[in-house]
Each structure stands twice: as C-alpha cells, then as structure tokens.
A protein has these predicted regions:
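Beta/alpha (TIM)-barrel catalytic core signal, keyed to glycine-rich beta->alpha loops juxtaposed to Asp/Glu
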Residues: 77-212
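A structural motif
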Residues: 10-13, 66-69, 101, 123, ...
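Short, acidic/polar
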Residues: 1-8, 49-64, 109-116
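Conserved, mostly hydrophobic/aromatic
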Residues: 8, 16, 29, 60, ...
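A short, structured active-site edge motif that brings together acidic residues
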Residues: 36-48, 71-75
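Active-site groove signature of glycoside hydrolases
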Residues: 62-80, 210
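Acidic (Asp/Glu)-rich catalytic clusters
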Residues: 29-38, 58-67, 117-121, 145-148
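N-terminal binding-site loop/beta-alpha segment at the start of enzyme catalytic domains
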Residues: 1-37
Length: 212
C-alpha cells in the first residue's frame, strides 16, 4: 500500500477515498501516514442512533491519524428517509463548524437521488457513478445543476466495476449488453487507445466533474 501511495503522489494524485466499512483501510492508511493527502471518508449507516454515527466518525479520525478530513460523505443514501436524518445532518454541520470536516456530502447512485438532494439539502460534495455507458447525469442535467450550485463532483465507477477493462469474464448481469460491449471494443481499438486510456479519457473530458 505504501508503494501504491508513493506512486499516486508522484503522479499528482492527492485524494484518497476510504470508509470505516472498507475493512481495515483507515487503520492501514493511518499507519502509513496520509498527512499529504486529502481524505474523503464516509459515515456508517444510520440505524436509529445518531450518536453512533458521530462516534464512528471520530474513530475514523483516530484511525487515520487526522485532525480533519477533506470530506465526509453520507454513505447510505437511504438514510435520508430515516426520521433521525435531519438530526444527523445538523450534527454533521456542527462537525464542519468545529473544523473536523471541510466538506459534507453524499454518495449517490441515481439521477433521482441527486435531484432529491439538490431540492432538499445544502451540501458541498457529491460522489456519483459515471462512465462511457452511464451518462444519465449529463443527459438529465444533474451534473450541470451541481456545477451551477458550486457543488464539488467526484465521479466513480468510471470503469463500470472493472467491466470496461476486461470483457472476457462478464457476469450474468452484464451479458445483456454483450453486443454493445463488442461494438465498444472495436471503437476503442480503432481509436488507438487502450481500454484503460479510452475509459479514463472519457471521464476526464467531462467539465462538470472535479475529480475521478
């Protein structure tokens, strides 16, 4: 992991995405030392006790060896339907005022979720899925709406869970798009780029996103 982080830093990658739910990732990062990186971490799911979520965040800070993180995302978007969520969101803003968080945000999956957040909450950061085969947020205008409000956009799943880098072992779920994937591979081959380069360049060219 240390070598990976060194390689990332040497290539001007300065943001790390993690979560307490990602095994022991926060502990590993904390042991290596991540003072020179911007850290994005995520909340545990809200299951009735707001204080457990806040306590978990403080544990994340301790594990990471940080006094502040760049961003804290609500990991489970379904938490917004919880009766306690308004209390949690208020607590998150208190953490921001205390200087423990620079940006509050959400991890999302669908355009509808983004629309709901834009209509109901003020936030700084959002993580959204985006790739060659998933441009719903451009077509629906959500990316432009986020940009117009000054909300930082982080694109994830730019390789479609790795599918865009390896078409030889498609799961049953993705077999439905096998014909489209075959045409895509021909297009990529004709471009002279590798599968990785093509998928990465596609996302890099999207002006509304801030990071991938």
């Amino acid at each position: 992991v240390r070598n990976i982080l060194t390689l990332a830093k040497n290539n001007k990658i300065d943001t790390l995405d993690t979560a307490s739910g990602y095994g022991n990732s926060e502990e590993v990062l904390g042991e290596i030392g991540v003072d020179n990186y911007q850290i994005i971490t995520k909340t545990i799911s809200l299951e009735g006790d707001v204080n457990k979520v806040i306590d978990s965040f403080h544990k994340s800070l301790e594990s990471l060896g940080q006094k502040q993180v760049e961003g804290l995302l609500v990991h489970d978007i379904n938490n917004v339907e919880n009766k306690q969520f308004d209390i949690l969101f208020s607590k998150l803003n208190e953490l921001k005022q205390q200087g423990l968080i620079k940006k509050i945000g959400f991890s999302t999956y669908t355009p509808g979720q983004v629309n709901f957040l834009l209509e109901n909450f003020g936030f700084d950061l959002i993580q959204v899925p985006f790739n060659v085969f998933d441009t719903r947020l451009i077509q629906g205008g959500q990316l432009q709406a986020l940009k117009s409000k000054g909300i930082e956009v982080h694109a994830r799943s730019i390789f479609l869970q790795g599918v865009l880098l390896d078409f030889d072992n498609l799961s049953d779920y993705f077999l439905t798009w096998k014909k489209q994937f075959t045409k895509y591979q021909v297009m990529v081959e004709n471009s002279g780029l590798s599968l990785l380069e093509y998928a990465l360049n596609f996302s890099l060219k999207i002006q509304e996103k801030n990071k991938i």
